[in-house]
Curated annotation (Swiss-Prot):
Protein name: Glycerol-3-phosphate acyltransferase
Top-rank taxon, per record: Bacteria
Keyword Cell membrane on entry: yes
Encoding gene, per UniProt annotation: plsY
InterPro entries the record matches: G3P_acylTferase_PlsY
Native source organism of the sequence: Desulforudis audaxviator (strain MP104C)
Entry's Gene Ontology BP terms: phospholipid biosynthetic process
GO molecular function term, any single one: acyl-phosphate glycerol-3-phosphate acyltransferase activity
Major localisation: membrane
EC number per UniProt: 2.3.1.275
Function, in words: Catalyzes the transfer of an acyl group from acyl-phosphate (acyl-PO(4)) to glycerol-3-phosphate (G3P) to form lysophosphatidic acid (LPA). This enzyme utilizes acyl-phosphate as fatty acyl donor, but not acyl-CoA or acyl-ACP.
Membrane topology recorded in Swiss-Prot or TrEMBL: Multi-pass membrane protein
The entry's keywords: Cell membrane, Lipid biosynthesis, Lipid metabolism, Membrane, Phospholipid biosynthesis, Phospholipid metabolism, Transferase, Transmembrane, Transmembrane helix
Bilayer-spanning residue ranges: 5-25, 114-134, 154-176
Catalytic activity: an acyl phosphate + sn-glycerol 3-phosphate = a 1-acyl-sn-glycero-3-phosphate + phosphate
Length: 198
């Protein structure tokens, strides 16, 4: 497989990740820019809070699908480990979307899609951590930060190879960076807790 094909599939994965699902849903449903409402984030949690649970779930499904598609694109080329690069490209696209002038979301739902397609140890660990932290605190941001941070450790302890550990480190670092405003609010006691009601 040529280097050009590899570059093209990574670029395509970035574009797939860049599709701003929550932004598009909010524009279509209410004619609003979701970035000007709630937390200002384009992700599923803010869509849930702003438009209601149904649209929040739709945003979650769409963003998760982007991660799945990116991994499938990488595997289609047949280069070992390329699915990790295309997965990382999708996360980068979601976090810094070319369609939103390089603004974007916090990568959690798209990370879920990527992890669904990788060895299950990281997904199982991250999901358990996320559910436990959310149940104890009702902070989606804290649950997401800790769950993302568990991914490289899960891959390392799961013995699936250094490439997966490096991908996990990338995912964790980007997730923490994208949640820096949430971290500041958590430290100040000003972060909003999640409610299943709109």
């Amino acid at each position: 497989m040529s280097a050009l094909a590899v570059i093209l599939v990574i670029g395509l994965s970035y574009l797939v990740g860049s599709v701003p699902t929550g932004y598009l849903i909010a524009r279509h449903v209410k004619g609003i820019d979701i970035r000007g409402h709630g937390s200002g984030n384009i992700g599923a949690t803010n869509v849930w809070r702003t438009l209601g649970p149904g649209w929040g779930l739709a945003s979650l499904v769409g963003d998760t699908a982007k991660g799945i598609v990116a991994v499938l694109l990488g595997r289609a080329v047949g280069v070992p480990g390329l699915e990790l690069l295309t997965g990382a490209a999708a996360l980068t696209g979601h976090g810094w979307s070319v369609f939103l002038r390089f603004q974007g979301g916090k990568i959690i739902a798209t990370s879920l899609g990527v992890l669904i397609m990788l060895p299950p140890v990281a997904l199982a660990t991250a999901a358990a951590v996320w559910i436990a932290v959310l149940a104890l605190t009702r902070y989606v941001s804290l649950a997401s930060i800790i769950a993302a941070s568990s991914v490289p450790l899960a891959f390392a302890l799961g013995g699936v190879g250094w490439r997966h550990v490096l991908f996990g480190l990338f995912l964790a670092l980007v997730a923490v960076y994208k949640h820096r405003a949430n971290i500041d609010r958590l430290l100040k006691g000003k972060e909003s807790r999640f409610s299943f009601r709109k």
